[in-house]
């Protein structure tokens, strides 16, 4: 499986009762089927996976797979601070029909670089699915260094990509330079997609694509084609929206945006809170300026 282009990090809609809004989730998935989106990431950070019960996780993943109807690959977000539990999640996601796994680095317990290597090796050996390593030190408190990632990729044939959200172009450049042909680097920061693709990344796992899928996909397509003049133009056009969608902790703003657009409602689950009134005004103005309301 080749990873390239724009993958959307799907939000998880909640209804007024606080449960999963299944109809809204189906609408959200359908909005991507012909928008140029390369694939769907379910139950990741943007999908509030940390707040889902086990049954909710299964239901969100199963609904996403069913509604995509085989038209787009579905990547299941998995990952805990325990390797054995993460292996269980990998097996479960595979049994539900996921096409690939986005595996979060262990959080809270701050493993060493060798511990990270052993963790990802154990997960990859217990699934036949392609694995995307998810490096997001701002949330996990541990950075997967380039040498560690390259060691993982070299020793684990089904580790096919990394979602790199360290914010470091130096780190991305080291990975691109050292990785085998076919290994993909995907941006984990919407604001850095074009800069990362300029040094060899293959695409993005995008929050912004929830609300502007066609534009985000077009930006990635231009960069992949080597048309960085067009990619920069699209980046500049999207950048104010990107800033607005990260004015508070993700996914608070994107869930508010989806509600304003009528795609789905429901505030995030505690401990995240609804977008503040001042920031709702800022976000609404930005969406209106782009013709999204």
How should these model regions be labeled?
Residues 1-8, 12-141, 151:
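Active-site beta->alpha loop and helix N-cap motifs at the rims of alpha/beta catalytic domains
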Residues 2, 7-13, 35-37, 198-201, ...:
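C-terminal alpha-helical cap/extension of soluble enzyme domains
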Residues 16, 22, 54, 146, ...:
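Alpha-helix N-capping/helix-start residues
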Residues 22, 26-29, 146, 280, ...:
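Short, amphipathic alpha-helical "lid/cap" segments that border enzyme active or binding sites
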Residues 25, 57, 61, 86, ...:
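A general structural signal for well-ordered alpha-helical segments in protein cores
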Residues 66-72, 96-97, 127-129, 154-158, ...:
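Short helix-capping segments at alpha-helix termini
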Residues 125, 139-246:
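Catalytic alpha/beta core domains of metabolic enzymes, predominantly
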Residues 135-136, 158, 269-270:
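Glycine-rich phosphate-binding "P-loop"
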């Amino acid at each position: 499986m080749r990873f390239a282009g724009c993958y959307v990090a799907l939000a998880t809609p909640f209804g007024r009762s606080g449960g999963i809004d299944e109809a809204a989730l189906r609408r959200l998935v359908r909005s991507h089927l012909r928008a140029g989106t390369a694939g769907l990431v379910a139950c990741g950070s943007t999908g509030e996976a940390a707040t889902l019960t086990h049954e909710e996780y299964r239901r969100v993943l199963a609904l996403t797979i069913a509604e995509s109807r085989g038209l787009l690959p579905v990547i299941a977000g998995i990952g805990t601070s325990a390797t054995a539990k993460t292996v269980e999640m990998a097996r479960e996601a595979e049994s539900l029909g996921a096409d690939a796994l986005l595996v979060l680095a262990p959080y809270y317990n701050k493993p060493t670089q060798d511990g990270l290597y052993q963790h990802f090796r154990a997960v990859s050996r217990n699934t036949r699915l392609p694995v995307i390593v998810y490096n997001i030190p701002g949330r996990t408190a541990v950075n997967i260094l380039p040498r560690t990632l390259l060691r993982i990729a070299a020793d684990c044939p089904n580790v096919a990509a990394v979602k790199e959200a360290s914010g470091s172009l130096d780190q991305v450049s080291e990975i691109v330079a050292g990785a085998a042909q076919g290994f993909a680097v995907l941006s984990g920061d919407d604001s850095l997609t074009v800069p990362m693709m300029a040094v060899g990344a293959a695409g993005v796992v995008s929050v912004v694509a929830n609300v502007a899928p066609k534009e985000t996909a077009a930006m990635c397509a231009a960069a992949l084609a080597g048309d960085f003049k067009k990619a920069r133009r699209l980046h500049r056009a999207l950048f104010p929206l990107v800033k607005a969608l990260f004015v508070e902790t993700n996914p608070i703003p994107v869930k508010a945006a989806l509600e304003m657009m009528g795609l789905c409602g429901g505030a995030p689950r505690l401990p995240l809170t609804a977008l503040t009134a001042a920031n709702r005004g800022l976000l609404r103005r930005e969406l209106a300026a782009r013709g999204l309301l």
